A protein has these predicted regions:
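Topogenic and prosegment regions of secretory-pathway hydrolases and membrane enzymes
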Residues: 7-34, 93, 97-102, 133-136, ...
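Soluble non-cytosolic domains of exported or imported proteins
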Residues: 11, 78-86, 116-120, 169, ...
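Subtilisin-like serine protease catalytic core
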Residues: 1-81, 181, 200-203, 258-271, ...
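Structured segments of extracytoplasmic/periplasmic soluble domains
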Residues: 94, 98, 106, 128-132, ...
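Hydrolase catalytic cores
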Residues: 210-287, 291
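Catalytic-core regions of hydrolytic enzymes
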Residues: 77-100, 122
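Loop/turn elements at helix/coil->beta-strand transitions in domains of secreted/extracellular proteins
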Residues: 50-55, 97-103, 131-137, 179-184, ...
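Substrate-binding/specificity loop regions of serine endopeptidase catalytic domains
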Residues: 109-205, 212-246
Length: 316
């Protein structure tokens, strides 16, 4: 679980140039004689909210495992693939208590809708963070085919009273399905089309880029765009998926919180959703209300809306 705090405002005398991460490229004799880039020219890796403060909280790891794990309980490692639901809940509460105003959850636990297990602890943690601590919670919708995740039906024309098709859900994506408190993010490709592997479900709120992702390596901090091979003979695997889409939207949420500090977490989510580029049907279970538009989220004239999710106030 990663948490993102709103970025501080830039100094008044700061220019629009991003800081340089290295010297300009040298010019060779057969290159055209053009002026070199000025000092401080960007290197192309800036990020959505480069001034945000990031707190990294590890709630699951391949390097560790529970002591004497049991597969009998609903939150067992055999049934819940991404850590445990309880460890996610503890991480969310810890992040909220540390003062994080945006919480990114780029992990997904997929369970059969007929047997979703006991998720009351996680639900209470999400309610606490979103309602009591006023944190924007952004989660990955999930990737079809990974750890029990699978696509749900898009729409049932025989039941217009249920436009998001909740009654036909076969696999729940947690924490995304707690959609009153969580903004679930699907993935699009480089052309803005829904990524085939992006898990569909009625909880998906918006979508963001999920391919051609650049990031920073945990070893050395240099730019990377793929996972290294895990076995001899394998090739690098480019970054893709809804985990990266969720991180993208978390950065947008940090910018919105910095620009509009008076908005509640629920109102920040409303601004991101209302400014998205809608799919042809207006909303669907793959893209939600559409592709996120950071500039529109920061500049459009959008009514603030309700301060809390419907019914949340009664539980405060």
């Amino acid at each position: 679980t990663q948490t993102v705090a709103p970025p501080p405002p830039p100094p008044e005398d700061a220019g629009a140039m991003a800081p340089s991460n290295g010297p300009p490229d040298p010019q060779t004799e057969d290159e055209p004689a053009v002026p070199p880039p000025p000092p401080g020219a960007p290197d192309g890796v800036v990020g959505v909210a480069p001034h945000a403060t990031i707190i990294s909280i590890r709630q699951s790891s391949r390097a560790f495992e529970p002591v004497n794990p049991s597969s009998a309980g609903p939150n067992s490692d055999e049934k819940v693939k991404a850590g445990t639901l309880d460890s996610v809940a503890r991480a969310v509460v810890h992040a909220a208590n540390m003062g994080a105003k945006v919480i990114n959850i780029s992990v997904t636990a997929c369970l059969p809708a007929a047997a979703p297990g006991d998720q009351r602890v996680l639900g209470a943690a999400l309610w606490y963070a979103a309602t009591v601590k006023d944190a924007v919670i952004v989660a990955a919708a999930g990737n079809d085919g990974e750890a029990g995740c699978g696509n749900n039906p898009m729409y049932d024309p025989l039941d217009p009273s249920d436009p998001r098709d909740w009654h036909q859900v076969t696999v729940v994506s947690s924490p995304s399905w707690f959609s009153d408190y969580v903004l679930s993010v699907g993935a699009v490709d480089a052309y803005g089309a829904a990524l085939d592997k992006s898990m569909s479900g009625p909880w998906v709120g918006v979508a963001a880029p999920g391919t051609h992702i650049m990031g920073l390596s945990p070893q050395g901090g240099g730019p990377v765009n793929a996972y290294p091979p895990s076995r001899p003979g394998e090739k690098n695997m480019p970054f893709w998926g809804t985990s990266f889409s969720a991180a993208y939207v978390s950065g947008v949420a940090a910018l919105v919180r910095a620009k509009f500090p008076e908005l509640t977490a629920y109102q920040v989510i409303n601004r991101i959703v209302q400014s998205a580029h809608n799919p042809p049907a207006g909303v669907d279970n793959k893209l939600g209300y559409g592709l996120v538009d950071p500039v529109a989220a920061l500049t459009f004239n959008i009514p603030s809306g309700d301060r809390m999710a419907p019914g949340a106030q009664s539980r405060v």
